[in-house]
């Protein structure tokens, strides 16, 4: 019960929480009003970096959402050329994470990490089409247990300036395992083959729990 009300936070949030807490204490001695505002901001920092446990649906027939947020695109596209898959057609689901969503990302399937590729870039609004090509991003090329290529892309947004990767090349992942996070508003794209989408544009998703696609 306690962990549902006060979930643990991601390690990336520790220093931000300490800094915000220290500033709050100082401001409370100077001004009750400023201290209260700072306290509210400290609570928001805690809320942003929360890392709640999820009930993972481990089923190789499904892909689960890699992110909390809102589905902004469901389409068929060429695979990402950055990982050498632009010669194949994939379906792609894009999920936008606003600053109030949990920003810890999870793998949509069980399988092996074949490649991780970081691409520096710009910081356009993550909901724009050009964000997939121009923004700072991190690619995870996975192979599911049936041999399908699944690619997850973390895309930094207008405010997000830090992509965190917690996964290694060659690592075997269980469905719903944490793979990283993005700070302060961002987007996750999932490219997949041989699955059919189960979500629609405008639908809210929960990482590790919402079923994105089915074989």
Regions found by a protein language model. Name each.
Residues 1-215:
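Contiguous, well-folded functional domains in the mature portion of proteins
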